[in-house]
Amino acid sequence: MAPAPTSVPLVSQPNVISDLKTALAVQGSASDHPRTLHQLLSQAAERYPLQQLGFISSSAHDSSIQTKSYSTFNQHVRNLARALTDWKKPVGSIVVVYLTEHEDNMAAVWACLLAGYIPCLQPALSAQQSHKEGHINHIKNLFLSATWLTNEIGAEQVMSVDGIDIHLFSDLKLAAEGYNVPADWAAVEAKPDDEAILFLTSGSTGFSKAVVHTHRTIIASCYAKGQSYGLTSETNVLNWVGFDHVAGSLEMHITPLLFGSYQLHVHASTILSDPLSFLRLIDDKSINIAFAPNFLLAKLARDLEKRSELYGAFDLSSVKRINSGGEAVVSKTAKIFVTVLKALAKDPSKVSFVVSAGFGMTETCAGCIYDPIDLSVINPMHEFLDLGRPIQGCEMRIVDPEDGITLRPDGESGELQVRGPMVFARYYNNPQATSSSFVEGRWYRTGDIGIIEKGVMRLSGRIKDTVIVHGVSYGIPELETYLQLVEGVTHSFLAAAPYRAPGQETEGFVVFYSPTFDLNEEDASNKLAATHRALRDISVKMITLPPQQIIPIPIDQMEKTTLGKLSRARLLTLFKQGELAKHIARADELLSEARGATFVVPATITETAFAKIFAGVFNLSTDDISAADNFFELGGTSIDVIRLKREGETVFGLPEIPIIQILKHPVLRDLAKYIDALVSKDNTQQEYDPIVPLQLTGNKTPIFFVHPGVGEVLIFVNLAKYFQNERPFYAFRARGFEPGQPFFSKMDEMVSSYAAAMKRTQPKGPYAIAGYSYGGVIAFEVAKRLEAGGDEVKFVGLINIPPHIADRMHEIDWTGGMLNLSYFLGLVSKQDADDLAPTLRPLTRKEQLDVVWKLSPPERLVELQLTPEKLDHWVDIAGSLIECGKDYNPSGSVAVADVFYAIPLRGSKSDWLNNQLKPWSGFSRTEPAFTDVPGRHYTLMDFDHVPQFQKIFRSRLEARGV
């Protein structure tokens, strides 16, 4: 007989009982507890005046920490609040806070609260103009007002929408300098059930909803969480989640503020660009509690597992708890992570911490269910870590998802529902959504499918239409809308469903569709291959991930509901149960047939050897590799190029296979021919050709990219793959890398060479060209040259480069050029490059290179296959390009220009845009488009930023009709 179904209340967690008692003793009696956020801030400043808030901003290249004491911060935000009241807005007015840095967001939110306003935290706006403007208008209509507090860059993004009342945070700070209010000043006295902070949902299934959290819901959540964590004034907390997320603001700021803990808030770019900094900060600041989602656990485990030279390098004895959320945590990954951290520790015996997977939502003030376990002694029972038991005051239950009421027995899956004082009050100005989110008893319907066994919860799926990739939620309906447009897909007979294969680190998805053609007709194999290729390409471009499986199902076997919809849940169930195996087998048969039509069996010894290398890189069978395969079309990245180079050198006993030759010979048989010639010494000096074809598929206008000031093109490899089956992607490489090649001595010579090569490659226009950094002015000059010859240039992309560069070129001496190159290559940090310059200048050239060489990470030198001699020569190439730019004075104009801007090397982004980049307007016959892109000058195309950059860049190509 099945046990009686019950809801699950709070269950005490034995491993935190002692810390809980300490926390409660520190906080005092219940009568001392603050009832509003105003009281909470006052209490923190009074009880812990010297405790610190630390911040590492996005522009802190050296990861330097700026600090404010609780007392100083309290005074700062109250002065800001007093300045805010000068806006003369009614009490209860909503202010959309749209800022980048933790410190600014934090101060703005508290200032709004103390001024009697309601802050609404706005995450990063979409790069798609129509989607961004649609969202801003939606927010304006939802709040019946449109007051935004932002910075200069945010104002640029928002001002395209009419009727927005924009205030700059810099102006507010300036105004606040004129006030010095009492330490307990507030414009209004808040009540526990007043609206406190609004958080926007992801909008993954439509426009965002605004989640209303009151003072009561926030404080209830923070108390329960702090007690669960065992927080005290001796605890050190590390946060890198954005402040616009409930985890960043409520869980990792207000919660430790309540308990008087030290807080270090780090901009996400610092951790994501260098995951090792996560461990350095734990070591340097004796961090006790930190957050690491599954993808970061996986990345750290994968990157550091083989880094034996780092073993024993970090003091990790302080860390006691690593929270993880946002996506399911793979048990195996978490175990490896713990093992690796112990190996990296100076004294592994002193490292003892729990990894706590958790469940939470915007609607629950972030985490409300946790399962802290010591993975060094406990082996998880399931593929993913359990999510555990509720915090104090929270209840959970599993019910029938159809009626939302009928309880499911212990161990049986169903819809997860939660309730408690930390659950949100309502959706702002949306009673219908609020009503549909709750059932009788104020149980909140999470939309997740879970199982509770012996009081411990784990998730098994989701009702909601989203797929999570590395913690980022993407809307399935939006993806389906674009996939429906693919030729070969029957309209309204396509569905995509989130799916995580056994052992997979992150979530993926499966596409089900009915083809417009009969799978038994004569040309079905080629049609199917083309359809699947298009479905993969669109998926990668929209959500950075291809489908795990694409399943064609005849239309007469694709059942719809009575409302005419496909059931994703039903299709996914059929897939998991093997009911679609015959359709998968038929598709595989046809795709193999299509591939067989173009399959070329590797014939020579060299081709066979490369087939083995290709197979190893892409985890394929050697029999599946064709001599006609293109390395990049198989999915090769810039890192894969390095691996191919190394393995090729080992197999063929060659001292070096130049990377450029791999880029120029990406097809297996062509690369084999080149190697045969190299081995036989029959590799005669080839005439310099600046064009490097990085991808050749697609029928749209080709795009040509000009190298940055280092002269190389490897940085474009990861970008080029996003253009597969859309348009060819060519890159220009500077002269001088190959033996015997002279450097360019004049810019005009370079422009003439590139323009001629462009015409040879694409004899007729219209043309599209872009240049990154220094390459931007070259692209501008090449476009002018083409237009002067009567050709149409429909796109000129100028990426983070001003028109006037001569002064900057004259500033760069040999030492500066060498350090710039070293920073660009990841050999030294930006701070090291700046600090070393005066020290190195008196030294000889060789001595300077020796210093940089010793500072360079050994693994990076191996990855780049650098030697001191190669680095020295590369510095000369970069120096020759600098010399070409010293006399450059822009003149003339092009028909159109698109300027892309990121965080500059020096100064603020707004100054960079307004004073350095806006002058491009004088060199375009139509007003240029200025487009903000994520990242810094040297990182905007790196692995972390290229998925967003390609979307933005391709949208501008589309806008220009290219």
Curated annotation (Swiss-Prot):
Residues 55-469 are annotated as: Adenylation (A) domain. Keywords: Phosphopantetheine, Phosphoprotein, Transferase. Residues 606-676 are annotated as: Thiolation and peptide carrier (T) domain. The modification O-(pantetheine 4'-phosphoryl)serine is found at residue 638. Induction: Up-regulated upon coincubation of the fungus with the terrestrial bacteria Streptomyces iranensis, Bacillus subtilis or Pseudomonas putida. It holds the Pfam family PP-binding. Residues 601-679 form the Carrier domain. One of its GO terms (molecular function) is transferase activity. The keyword Phosphoprotein applies. Belongs to the ATP-dependent AMP-binding enzyme family. An L-tyrosine:2-oxoglutarate aminotransferase (probably amt1) and atromentin synthetase nps3 catalyze consecutive steps to turn over L-tyrosine into atromentin, which represents the generic precursor molecule for the entire terphenylquinone and pulvinic acid family of pigments, which are widely distributed secondary metabolites in homobasidiomycetes. The first step catalyzed by the aminotransferase converts L-tyrosine in to 4-hydroxyphenylpyruvate (4-HPP). This is Atromentin synthetase nps3. It comes from Serpula lacrymans var. lacrymans (strain S7.9). The lineage of its organism: Eukaryota, Fungi, Dikarya, Basidiomycota, Agaricomycotina. The gene is nps3.
